[in-house]
Amino acid sequence: MAEAAFHPPRRKRRVFECYQAPFPVGPGAGDFRMCRADMVNNCVVVRSPEDMDQLYNKGYFGKGILSRSRPVYSISDPSLVSKWQGANLNVPIITSKKYQQRVQWAKSALQEQGFDGCSVTKILENYTRPLEFPFLEKGGAEQTGDSCDTVCPNTENTELSGQSSTDTGNIATSSPECQKEVCQKAYAEGDPASDSMVGSKEQEPADVKETAQTSCQMHGSCMHCGCKAKGAPDRESCNMAKSRERAPEYVLVQEEEESSLCPEEGSAREQENFVKKEKLVCRRNPFRIFEYLQLSLEEAFFLVYALGCLTVYYGEEPLTILKLWEIFSEVKPSFKTTYMAYHYFRSKGWVPKVGLKYGTDLLLYRKGPPFYHASYSVIAELVDDNFEGSLRRPLSWMSLSGLNRTTVNASKELLLCYLIKPSDMTEEEMATPECLKRIKVQELIVTRWVSSRERSEQDDL
């Protein structure tokens, strides 16, 4: 057997963040934080923004359900955010067309719940009416009347011109309070029928000022998440997370209105004097989509068993380590094998991620996906002392060659991880995670043998 040649990990050219910590646990007792996750539809999800930030930034555990990796989903239109960036806004900005689309989604959701057309129309009219605009940053708290209106004459030969306006009517309108019965009916944004992650208990939305004045550094200045300050008890954090899910989300809708620059009537160029004036109107989002941090079963069990910084709940009942081992093994028959490999490589300092994209069990990153490309694609197999047993993935020479080619073309190396269990290990021992103490690991790196290269090396010798 030839000796393996190890290649250093390839660092990414553009890195936009700093490395914080390998694990979400600190050296001191004051830095420790117990996070919470929920078992939903055989998946483990984290709902609290603070827990999501803790688990992803320190160890890169999980991924956002609406994002490629980091949970940074926002409904804001990027072009509108850059256009209105001088207004110091901290709530999402969307177009009128996108808002009407969400109104239609909310209408369909309410009709599916049994409401008639008249009731649905009345509910949505009350729920989506314009509100007062209290969501400015601290730097612009005294400038509630400022706006960045774009004035566009309704003619083809006129250029766009931007001008500043101090008219408070451009953004602010009436400020009615959220009526209890309307909010309870118009719960398309937090209703279990439209969001399976939200619980079944109804709760009155929180006050506008209490939820809107909190800004989260993780989500940026253009996204309202309502994250609470650090240092609060876990129970209070859970209650605030639930109330935040049921509280309304406020958005700024860019709308157009026509106005006349020349008040004289009977003018020959009256049509040219009408302009389209863009303004931001604050409204409730009738159909809210939540993003959560989804953990793989291996990541969730590692956080519970190895680090002890996560508690997984099923409903309101916390699950024990033995119960999680049993449930995860039923949900995923190969869980024991893949977790053994995950635990081994995590302990070695690698950041394992799901390798489904390349047809393997795991991908190994140094530090994390934002800093380095994946170095290895791992296939894990559980065998006995004689390297015998029922393999999860019997590989023929053709399939092994194809898998290796796929891995090499992505600038990675194929690694076979054999988890060797003693011959005297019983099924009772395998039923608990204590079996990890008796497992041995052997790694094999697969390389393609090239005959011409071998001949040239022999000739050189």
Swiss-Prot record:
GO biological process: mRNA processing; tRNA processing; tRNA-type intron splice site recognition and cleavage
Any single Pfam family the record assigns to this protein: tRNA_int_endo
Family: Belongs to the tRNA-intron endonuclease family.
Name used for this protein in its record: tRNA-splicing endonuclease subunit Sen2
Transmembrane segments: none
Catalytic center residues: Y365, H373, K412
Subcellular locations according to the entry: Nucleus
Ranges annotated as biased composition (Polar residues): 144-176
CDD domains (alphabetical): tRNA-intron_lyase_C
Protein keywords: Lyase, mRNA processing, Nucleus, tRNA processing
Gene Ontology MF terms: lyase activity; nucleic acid binding; tRNA-intron endonuclease activity
EC nos: 4.6.1.16
Domain of life: Eukaryota
UniProt enzyme class: lyase
Subunit structure: tRNA splicing endonuclease is a heterotetramer composed of SEN2, SEN15, SEN34/LENG5 and SEN54.
Function: Constitutes one of the two catalytic subunit of the tRNA-splicing endonuclease complex, a complex responsible for identification and cleavage of the splice sites in pre-tRNA. It cleaves pre-tRNA at the 5'- and 3'-splice sites to release the intron. The products are an intron and two tRNA half-molecules bearing 2',3'-cyclic phosphate and 5'-OH termini. There are no conserved sequences at the splice sites, but the intron is invariably located at the same site in the gene, placing the splice sites an invariant distance from the constant structural features of the tRNA body.
Catalytic activity: pretRNA = a 3'-half-tRNA molecule with a 5'-OH end + a 5'-half-tRNA molecule with a 2',3'-cyclic phosphate end + an intron with a 2',3'-cyclic phosphate and a 5'-hydroxyl terminus
Matches recorded under InterPro entries: tRNA_endonuc-like_dom_sf, tRNA_intron_Endo_cat-like_sf, tRNA_intron_Endonuc_cat-like, tRNA_intron_Endonuc_N, tRNA_splic, tRNA_splic_SEN2
Entry GO terms, CC: cytoplasm; tRNA-intron endonuclease complex
Residue ranges, compositional bias (Basic and acidic residues): 201-210
Region of interest (Disordered), residue spans: 140-176, 190-210
Keyword presence, Metal-binding: no
